[in-house]
């Protein structure tokens, strides 16, 4: 095997390599064994013709294509290793020569990972994060819990106020014609929740049960239903009931109803404070880590990102997003219809994020290389054990899903990230 790498562009080049006679012969044997199974030759039983007879009748060249397909993947991988390059996409293969009795010469047009010139990535200065939990934070959490425990009580002959819930029938019209999706019966709407079109809820404030009212609105220009976007509409609304929230008393009984592990309101407040502190600490650490990584990426220099890397990352993001939609019962076609968008729009939406993620991954890989981060088999075994416990599955199953190379790469990336984040200083 001899391999030669010739750079043609920032991230592109041509890899020329040869396939030796011994390897070619192995490929020819595989190709012949595949072909002869279905070969009918006079004087021979089906599939029993000899290689010599085949070559005399059809010529050895008839096997070249299948032979090349058999040996090319391994030969290409060996050439890549010898040349010391890291391809990021499938190569475009061309045959330079396939002469009998000579090594075959192959060329491959290859896109490789771009060069990353690291800047500062250790001891980076990041913004000081807010980790303090105040009494106001605890009271706000308590208030949310109180709101969630509230009961709705009918207001007899009383006008609706913001915060009240009205039970309504409604039907929307464009001019004199009702439009699809604009009708509802016995719908509970909290006034001030902004869950309806802007202006709709405001016009129900002050109304009482039994009243009928016409609500005039204008749909937003960016409304998801294109046939309604920017248009004026009238909703005929009947108010059936007006309900007010009745909040429970903030006392020890309330505390025990919320959490049976506490005996008093003070205990509940302390538990909330602890939970809020843990959450704020986790959020602060995450924000610190994200800023440190962002700075490390900004400090690095990548002349040009290969388009194919960004393209692949976009499609990974799109597939993940659409699969999540599918799990919620929304097909891609339905999503595009509901949002008035196209596959191309979604592609553009993910492009910026994909470019950032691609740059970030390249910089983290470069840090791992610069730090000479090594991963042992013991490290891999420990990672498999952790993943098996985390996902409650046998270790053997983890190894089936993630091979050693994938696990080694993940561990190296984690340690490179830790090199950046654990040395960052808040100021």
From Swiss-Prot:
Recorded GO molecular functions are: peptidyl-prolyl cis-trans isomerase activity; protein folding chaperone; ribosome binding
Catalysis performed (reactions): [protein]-peptidylproline (omega=180) = [protein]-peptidylproline (omega=0)
Provide the PPIase FKBP-type domain boundaries: 163-248
Please list the GO biological process terms of this entry.
'de novo' cotranslational protein folding; cell division; chaperone-mediated protein folding; protein transport; protein unfolding
Query: Which cellular component terms (GO) are annotated to the entry?
Result: cytoplasm
Which superkingdom, per the lineage?
Bacteria
**UniProt keywords, alphabetically:** Cell cycle, Cell division, Chaperone, Cytoplasm, Isomerase, Rotamase
Q: What is its EC number?
A: 5.2.1.8
Give the family per the record: Belongs to the FKBP-type PPIase family. Tig subfamily.
Biological function: Involved in protein export. Acts as a chaperone by maintaining the newly synthesized protein in an open conformation. Functions as a peptidyl-prolyl cis-trans isomerase.
Q: What is known of its domains?
A: Consists of 3 domains; the N-terminus binds the ribosome, the middle domain has PPIase activity, while the C-terminus has intrinsic chaperone activity on its own.
Q: What is this protein called?
A: Trigger factor
């Amino acid at each position: 095997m001899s391999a030669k790498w010739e750079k043609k562009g920032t991230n592109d080049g041509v890899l020329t390599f040869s396939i030796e006679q011994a390897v070619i012969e192995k490929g020819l044997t595989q190709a012949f064994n595949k072909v002869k199974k279905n070969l009918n030759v006079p004087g021979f039983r089906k599939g029993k013709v000899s290689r010599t007879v085949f070559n005399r009748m059809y010529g050895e060249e008839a096997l070249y294509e299948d032979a090349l397909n058999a040996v090319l993947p391994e030969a290409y991988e060996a050439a890549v290793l010898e040349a010391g390059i890291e391809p990021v996409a499938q190569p475009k293969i061309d045959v330079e020569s396939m002469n009998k009795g000579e090594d075959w010469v192959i060329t491959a047009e290859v896109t490789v990972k771009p060069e990353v010139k690291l800047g500062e990535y250790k001891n980076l200065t990041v913004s000081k994060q807010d980790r303090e939990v105040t009494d106001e934070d605890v009271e706000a959490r308590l208030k949310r819990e109180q709101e969630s425990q509230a009961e709705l009580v009918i207001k007899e002959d009383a006008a609706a106020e913001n915060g009240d819930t009205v039970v309504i029938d409604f039907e929307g019209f464009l001019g004199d014609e009702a439009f699809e999706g604009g009708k509802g019966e016995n719908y509970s709407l909290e006034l001030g929740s902004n869950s309806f079109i802007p202006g709709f809820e405001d016009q129900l404030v002050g109304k009482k049960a039994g009243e009928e009212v016409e609500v005039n609105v204008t749909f937003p220009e960016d409304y998801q239903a294109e046939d309604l976007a920017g248009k004026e509409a009238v909703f005929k609304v009947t108010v059936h009931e007006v309900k007010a929230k009745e909040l429970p008393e903030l006392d020890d009984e309330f505390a025990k109803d919320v959490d049976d592990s506490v005996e008093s309101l003070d205990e509940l407040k302390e538990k909330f404070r602890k939970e809020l502190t843990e959450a704020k600490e986790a959020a602060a650490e995450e924000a610190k880590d994200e800023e440190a990584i962002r700075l490390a990426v900004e400090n690095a220099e990548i002349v040009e990102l290969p388009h194919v890397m960004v393209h692949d990352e976009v499609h990974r993001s799109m597939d993940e997003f659409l699969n999540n939609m599918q799990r919620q019962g929304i097909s891609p076609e339905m999503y595009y219809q509901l949002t008035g968008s196209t596959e191309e729009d979604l592609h553009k939406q993910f492009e910026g994020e994909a470019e950032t993620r691609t740059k970030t991954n390249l910089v983290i890989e470069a840090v791992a290389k610069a730090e000479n981060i090594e991963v042992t088999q013991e490290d891999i075994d420990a990672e498999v054990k952790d993943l098996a416990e985390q996902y409650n599955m046998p270790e053997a199953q983890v190894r089936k899903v993630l091979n050693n190379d994938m696990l080694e790469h993940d561990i190296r990336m984690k340690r490179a990230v830790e090199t950046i984040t654990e040395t960052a200083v808040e100021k």
